[in-house]
Swiss-Prot record:
GO biological process: vesicle-mediated transport
Entry keyword set: Cell membrane, Disulfide bond, Glycoprotein, Lipoprotein, Membrane, Receptor, Repeat, Signal, Transmembrane, Transmembrane helix
Residue ranges that the UniProt entry lists as topological domain Cytoplasmic: 191-337
Extracellular side: 14-169
UniProt-recorded name of the protein: Low-density lipoprotein receptor class A domain-containing protein 3
Gene Ontology CC annotations of this record: plasma membrane
Biological source species: Xenopus tropicalis (Western clawed frog)
Domain LDL-receptor class A: 24-61, 66-103, 108-144
Region feature Disordered, mapped onto this chain: 243-337
PANTHER family: LOW-DENSITY LIPOPROTEIN RECEPTOR CLASS A DOMAIN-CONTAINING PROTEIN 3 (PTHR24270:SF24), LOW-DENSITY LIPOPROTEIN RECEPTOR-RELATED (PTHR24270)
Keyword Nuclease: no
Length: 337
């Protein structure tokens, strides 16, 4: 008989799960949930619900808080959240203790917070942010319309929305200052470079002789004649028909020529040649030859070019203007080029 009862009891304990849980819960140190499931006793009141009905986190003594003055301690005593997250419509604590008994604390729903229509309180920064923080969408109503007088809802002011504007302003000002400094430095470098170029110009100019300014470059044709006339300066005549003479820069004045000792030839200070006697001057019908400073003698008329020169065509001397001032009747010299 006793053997039969023992067999029936073992079969019943294996077929009925409730009895199995009861057997496990009889072990010292285990906790039985409200649905009959057993969990280790160390999981009870640890801040994490292990039972499906969360009965292991109910009626737990509040642990000693280790949070700072600006934080809210969760019921488990392990987690801490920012104080302003308490009663904001979201369960920030794992056990949801931050959203319990919110309406029972009038200080948590003071005028500094937003009152939802379902009697929840959230922070002002969550109003009109595009999210349903009140769980009834009351924090997203009338976001683009002006606030009605006497309404209990407070909306985020423009000052709260512009919290980050000072940093943006400082960034723009700093960028502008850096840009101005870079432009000023670039302008200073260009000015210094230009000043150096201007200072180096006179050095190159002094390296050339001073007489280069008196040089005349002539584009000689195949047949040409150049006439040097003291009164009219230098005249250029082409052999291919008479062209209008080109007036070139006149020779230097007498004072400049006398003072310019470097351009004097060696025979400049020699005495003049002897003049012929009166009888010889009467018998001669031609003027005495004129000796130029270069040492070559020429007659009063134009000098013929020797054969083989590129300019063999003679050109008459340009007639003088009768209205011009009287000169010393110095002869002109024609030199073939």
């Amino acid at each position: 008989m006793w053997l039969l009862y023992l067999i029936l009891g073992s079969v019943e304990s294996q077929l009925l799960p409730g009895n199995n849980h009861t057997t496990e819960c009889n072990i010292p140190g285990n906790f039985m949930c409200s649905n009959g499931r057993c969990i280790p006793g160390g999981w009870q009141c640890d801040g994490n619900p292990d039972c499906f009905d969360e009965s292991d986190e109910k009626e737990c003594p509040r642990a000693r808080s280790r949070c700072g003055p600006n934080f809210f301690p969760c019921t488990s005593g392990i987690h801490c959240i920012i104080a302003r997250f308490q009663c904001n419509g979201f369960e920030d604590c794992p056990d949801g203790s931050d959203e319990e008994n919110c309406t029972a604390h009038p200080l948590l729903c003071s005028n500094s917070r937003f009152h939802c229509k379902n009697h929840l309180c959230i922070d002002k920064s969550f109003v009109c942010d595009g999210q349903n923080n009140c769980l009834d969408n009351s924090d997203e109503e009338h976001c683009h319309s002006p606030q009605e007088p006497g309404s209990e809802q407070d909306y985020v002011s423009s000052e709260n929305q512009l919290l980050y504007y000072p940093s943006i302003t400082y960034t723009i000002i700093g960028s502008s200052v850096i840009f101005v400094l870079v432009v000023a430095l670039l302008a200073l470098v260009l000015h210094h470079q230009r000043k150096r170029n201007l200072m180096s110009l006179p050095v190159h100019r002094l390296q050339h002789p001073l007489l280069l300014s008196r040089l005349v470059v002539l584009d000689h044709p195949h047949h040409c004649r150049v006439t040097y006339n003291v009164n009219n300066g230098i005249q250029y005549m082409s052999g291919q028909g008479y062209q209008q003479p080109v007036s070139v820069e006149s020779p230097p004045s007498y004072t400049e020529a006398v003072l310019d000792h470097s351009s004097r030839p060696p025979w400049f200070d020699l005495p003049p040649p002897p003049y012929p006697s009166d009888m010889e001057s009467v018998s001669q019908t031609e003027l005495p030859p004129y000796r130029s400073r270069t040492g070559s003698s020429a007659s009063a008329g134009s000098t013929e070019h020797p054969r083989g020169t590129p300019c063999g065509t003679e050109s008459p001397t340009e007639p003088q203007d009768p209205t011009a001032a009287p000169s010393d009747d110095l002869p002109s010299t024609e030199v073939d080029v």
